[in-house]
Amino acid sequence: MKINNLLLIGTFFFILCCFPFIELQANELKPTDTIEYFDDGSYYEITLQEDLNIFRSSTKNGSKTVTYKSANGTTLWSVTVHGSFYFNGTSAKCTNSTVSTTCPASTWKITSASSSKSGASASATATAKQYISGKLSQTKTKTVTLQCSSSGKLS
């Protein structure tokens, strides 16, 4: 009986001690979107996604995606920068930057994609080309940048 009570008390104190380190913020799971329109009605949809971090820490991971869509909302292609950051309240630093792309539209092709990091920023650049009847119709190059503040806020 005493061992069970000690185990119960020990478990209670363990949970009590660890609870302040748990950081469950539902708003971190919701992406934030902005839109940039072109004259022909097509647009870039820009989405910021912050990865959930259940323990308070000085690291932050997230991604920023630019999706190019037609005037009717069809996704043509996208480029995403994935960034990892370290922050300490006075400064921030990007520790890793990677790029990923998608191209579901048959008339578009991603011809190049690269990523880089500098200071507290992670960047990715992609070039997409549209071919109609085998001929180049248009080219779009887009750079997306993910930044981290000294307090760990991604933008």
Q: Across the structure, where does each feature detected by a protein language model lie?
A:
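Mature secreted bioactive peptide module from preproproteins
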Residues: 53-155
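N-terminal prepro-regions of secreted/extracellular proteins
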Residues: 1-73
